[in-house]
Amino acid sequence: MTISTLSNETTKSGSCSGQGKNGGKDFTYGKKCFTKEEWKEQVAKYSAMGELYANKTIHYPLKIQPNSSGGSQDEGFATIQTTPIEPTLPRLLLNYFVSMAYEDSSIRMAKELGFIRNNKDIAVFNDLYKIKERFHIKHLIKLGRINEAMEEINSIFGLEVLEETFNATGSYTGRTDRQQQQQQQQFDIDGDLHFKLLLLNLIEMIRSHHQQENITKDSNDFILNLIQYSQNKLAIKASSSVKKMQELELAMTLLLFPLSDSADSGSIKLPKSLQNLYSISLRSKIADLVNEKLLKFIHPRIQFEISNNNSKFPDLLNSDKKIITQNFTVYNNNLVNGSNGTKITHISSDQPINEKMSSNEVTAAANSVWLNQRDGNVGTGSAATTFHNLENKNYWNQTSELLSSSNGKEKGLEFNNYYSSEFPYEPRLTQIMKLWCWCENQLHHNQIGVPRVEN
């Protein structure tokens, strides 16, 4: 196995790295070969240093193992027992399955971790996390059966769960006016999911009408019914916000562009912004938003049950914080300097990840890219852009531009700060994957080599 690495140390031969013309270190790409056993040792070494895997026993060299008097014992090795900690990866997977409402996978993983032992536990587990109900609601939305989904939500949770009002105080105290304004803008986009479902239902009604073979026969009646639906269900909500009114107007524009076969050369091509409204991925996006809102609704009850010892299950929605707040000090020395001489700010190990990412202007701007669950719809000039962003969840194409523009030059790109208390219900595994991508983008931006396996 040959690994391409960035060497920042001088070697005797100077073939991989050496002194630069000015006597400084020459940062060049070198190659180092590992056998499978050596590579496994390297992986195990850094995994242990970062404490990413928790074992029941830890082997300490006796020469560094402290004794009761504070000194150290003779050389050799000894094993001490430690408190068993739940394996990281299975816990992450269980958090993902429960959050995404995958019933079978959740039950299997919970059985492997020992949380479920019999059929009674399965029933209690499902009732606590509402996995079946949330999956059914998501499924209905993805099929375009929006009325059925809203009836299901109303019967189980109540529609008011989708109409959460923005609170500028409470959890928002201590934030600057700018932060509260950004949070208000984000709420305007993602807050009223009841309106989004009603609007999506309007789109599905128009889609269904256009797919009929003979649409001219009942066209007038359909338009009258559609206008009545908009007045009764959407008008009041839309009148409270310019953005909502723009979204409603854009959806109503679909009536002017009937669906037509691509083979028909005389047909009018549907504009891109309207194509996005018909996109199936828009259903999935809204289904995921609804699922997160339902998780936020049931989580306090779950915490109450656990705090009062009424539940044998742990809080699987709020994963072990050690997963996100690991001590990464051992890795930082390798990221001190980029090959272009750029100094990378040292990351303190006693901060949570979201604070680490905001330690300087460059990382603060990129932080909003990987942590922000929404697509930076703030400041969009039209409803078309809003719906386009709803459909396309593109986190990474703008990273380089953000990193460049934030280095002392403001280009007017605004992204909301991420507050862990606001949107904690995205699966932790997804957050870690975003963190991984963010780190790779940072390494690439600072011209730091990443090990790669070559054939």
UniProtKB/Swiss-Prot annotation:
Residues 1-21 are annotated as: Disordered. Residues 1-19 have a biased composition (Polar residues). It holds the Pfam family CTLH. The keyword Nucleus applies. One of its GO terms (biological process) is proteasome-mediated ubiquitin-dependent protein catabolic process. Signal peptide: none annotated. GO terms for cellular component: cytoplasm; GID complex; nucleus. It is found in: Nucleus; Cytoplasm. It comes from the Eukaryota. Its main location: nucleus. InterPro entries: CRA_dom, CTLH/CRA, CTLH_C, Ubq-SigPath_Reg. Residues 130-213 form the CTLH domain. Keywords: Cell cycle, Cytoplasm, Nucleus, Ubl conjugation pathway. Residues 85-117 form the LisH domain. PANTHER family: RAN BINDING PROTEIN 9-RELATED. Component of the GID E3 ligase complex recruiting N termini and catalyzing ubiquitination of proteins targeted for degradation. GID E3 is regulated through assembly with interchangeable N-degron-binding substrate receptors induced by distinct environmental perturbations. Required for the adaptation to the presence of glucose in the growth medium; mediates in association with the substrate receptor VID24/GID4 the degradation of enzymes involved in gluconeogenesis when cells are shifted to glucose-containing medium. Present with 639 molecules/cell in log phase SD medium. Identified in the GID/CTLH complex. In the absence of stress, the complex exists as an inactive anticipatory complex (GID(Ant)), composed of VID30/GID1, the E3 ubiquitin-ligase RMD5/GID2, VID28/GID5, GID8, and the RING-like subunit FYV10/GID9, awaiting a substrate receptor to form the active E3 ligase complex. When cells are shifted to glucose-containing medium, the substrate receptor VID24/GID4 is induced and becomes part of the complex, named GID(SR4). Belongs to the GID8 family. This is GID complex subunit 8. It comes from Saccharomyces cerevisiae (strain ATCC 204508 / S288c). The gene is GID8.
